[in-house]
């Protein structure tokens, strides 16, 4: 299997590669959505 791609901790990020290699979120925001969905954005409208 793909090393890391199947890891729930990184959620294979947004591009299909382990985001953990560049710092988990690294400002990408892709992995952040997986563990922390943008609730304030939808509830603020």
Swiss-Prot record:
Gene Ontology terms: biological process: regulation of blood pressure; vasodilation
InterPro entries in the cross-refs: Natr_peptide, Natr_peptide_CS, Natriuretic_peptide_brain
Disulfide bonds: 14-30
Membrane among keywords: no
Tissue occurrence: Expressed by the venom gland.
Pfam family, one: ANP
MF term (GO), any: hormone activity
Family indicated by similarity: Belongs to the natriuretic peptide family.
Protein name from the UniProt record: Natriuretic peptide OsNP-d
Species whose genome carries this gene: Oxyuranus scutellatus scutellatus
